[in-house]
Design a protein with these regions (language model features):
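Transmembrane beta-barrel outer-membrane domains
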Residues: 48-50, 86, 109, 141-145, ...
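Flexible glycine-/small-residue-rich
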Residues: 2-5, 59-61, 69-71, 100, ...
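Short acidic/polar hinge/loop motifs at secondary-structure boundaries
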Residues: 73-102
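Short, acidic, small-residue-rich periplasmic hinge/interaction motif at the N-terminus
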Residues: 1-26, 34, 62, 120
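Extracytoplasmic beta-strand/coil segments of soluble accessory domains associated
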Residues: 17, 34-76, 94
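N-terminal periplasmic accessory domains that precede
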Residues: 33-36, 53-56, 68, 83-88, ...
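Periplasmic-side early beta-strands and strand-to-turn transitions of outer-membrane beta-barrels
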Residues: 129-130, 134-136, 140, 147, ...
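Short beta-strands and strand-coil junctions in structured, solvent-facing domains, enriched
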Residues: 6-8, 64, 74-75, 102-106, ...
Length: 232
């Protein structure tokens, strides 16, 4: 059975687990965590400009949605306010695993909405066969932002070595003229004073979303040894 609106099968709709590959994330460019997952069924994003996008799973967010990195809980300030971003590095990752609903209790306690696990390539679980270099450059006009990224992985003397660096800086999100709606205040006792305040208020339009700027720098380095017994 396939839903015509969603173009997915019934089994896919009922499955609480979804895996998004690293190549799919790379095709999106520099995006927030919420925006990267926004296309998944049951997942949406609470955005604040282009840099901030907190994921919402089945209508739940904040402490009800737990963010993990390689299985370890990420502790940042994203839960303090809507204008705080999730401190995760989506540059050159392996995959993102999303578990929706009560099934997430199998992997983390105190979670009712779901969990999101970012799996990166810092610790290789298989031997690196060929040396791989990746370089990324990006610019965004809506916030005068730019981003650069670099990563390399290789096998040196039987050890798998990985290094990556990313740097992103985005200004305040531009807002088109006239897009801001003002709540008018009426004072029957002083109409003249109100008219003056009205003009001053609209003169203060700044043309951008305040506090939507962001900057992030991330460095990852890892070494692993793979053998028949596993990896370390």
């Amino acid at each position: 059975v396939q839903a015509s609106l969603l173009n997915v099968t019934e089994d896919e709709i009922g499955d609480p687990l979804h895996i998004l590959s690293g190549s799919d994330i790379s095709d999106l460019g520099t995006v927030s965590l919420g925006e990267a997952l926004d296309s998944l069924v049951g997942v949406s994003s609470a955005d604040y400009g282009s840099a901030v996008g907190q994921p919402i799973i089945r209508g739940l967010s904040g402490s009800r949605v737990k963010i993990l990195n390689n299985g370890l809980v990420k502790r940042d300030v994203a839960g303090i306010g809507a204008d705080h971003k999730n401190e995760v590095d989506l540059n050159d990752i392996q995959q993102i695993e999303v578990v929706r609903g009560p099934s997430s209790l199998l992997y983390a306690n105190g979670v009712t909405g779901g969990i999101i696990n970012i799996v990166d390539n810092t610790i290789a679980m298989e031997d690196v066969v060929d040396r791989v270099f990746k370089l990324g450059l990006e610019t965004q006009s809506v916030n005068s932002g730019d981003a650069q990224s670099f990563s390399v992985k290789d096998n040196l003397g039987g050890l798998n070595v990985y290094f990556s660096y990313s740097d992103a800086s985005f200004g305040n999100y531009d807002v088109p003229s006239g897009a801001i709606l003002h709540e008018e205040e009426h004072d029957e006792d002083d109409d003249d004073h109100e008219d003056g305040d009205h003009d001053d208020h609209h003169d203060d339009d700044k043309g951008y979303l305040e506090n939507s700027d962001s900057a992030q720098e991330a460095i990852r380095f890892g070494v692993s040894k793979v053998a028949d017994w596993g990896y370390v």
